[in-house]
Amino acid sequence: MRPLRRECVLCYSQDDLLRCGACKVARYCSREHQKEDWVMHKIFCKPVTKEQKNLDKEETALRAHPDRPFEEVVGQFWRFQPSRPYMLARSDFISALGDVNTYDSVACALDHSLDMLRLSLSDGMGVRKSVPSLFLRLGREQEAYDFIKGWAKYMQPDGGDNGMPPHTWFRDADVFEPVELAMDNYNFLNHALDLLLLKVKLLLDLLALQKSPFDMNSLLTTLVRNRIDELRASGLEALIEKVKDHIKLLCESLKSQNSHIWTVLFNPEANSATTACYSLGSMDEARVAVHISYPAWAEALESLDWVENFVQSN
């Protein structure tokens, strides 16, 4: 799979793009390409449009509720029973967006997910499971790390609750810090998968920086692209060894959490989610986790290949 960009769905041109007027999350360089792609696009466009209309209907009904939930119940939406049809409709809309697989559909799904977490701090629907991989697919690695760290902190016994969504607790956290926090009392297997992907992309970028001359276009992360001089001054060898240690710990943690995780991750045909209910450590848990995180891995195949080789050699 190609890394996501704002580009024509058909020819990948990035100039003078038009949006699909129905789903709003597919772009084309011309009306001709839009017409040419319609037979395929309508398979995904129509469900998105349908779920958007249903969401609009539920939002209109909820905004008319006498308890004024959008003003008075923010942060407690899932506990407020009348808001549940709206939250479920929003979740269905996000699911429909996931089938479109464009930059705009992922960005839209992320925006809706973050707003759902603002409305419902308890996250009774498990929206937080998918957010880091959405950040990663958009090239927003720092925000992915801040999100993972915030929820890892929240899940600790002394994590606390300041009334703000956990993903807002940290900003520009150090991606080179120890990973133990993210492994203790962890809440979702796929967050650990997403953190592993982030660390491997980071490692590959650091290794690329060692090459002379290096190709700026080969860098996978903005974390490295925006800090080249700083990272070189810090000493690349030490950073590389540190990140390798983090990767080793994460791989060990993932295997201990679920022994099926590598079988599913390295065999895409086996990663289809079969159920929303599963027991910890089961094959179904691994399938659900990989189903959520795999698009981000598929758009970073160098990282997937590196992890597979690392796991097989260790």
Predicted regions and their residues:
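Acidic, polar low-complexity intrinsically disordered regions
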Residues: 64-68, 84-86, 103, 119-120, ...
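Helix-turn-helix repeat elements of alpha-solenoid scaffolds
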Residues: 47-71, 99-111, 139
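Cys/His-coordinated zinc-finger cores
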Residues: 20-45
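Long C-terminal extensions of eukaryotic subunits of large macromolecular complexes
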Residues: 1-7, 12-17, 32, 221-314
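Internal amphipathic alpha-helical repeat/solenoid segments
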Residues: 2-14, 53-81
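Acidic/polar, low-complexity linker and loop regions
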Residues: 1-6, 82-116
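Amphipathic alpha-helical repeat scaffolds of TPR domains
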Residues: 79-99, 121-137, 161-212
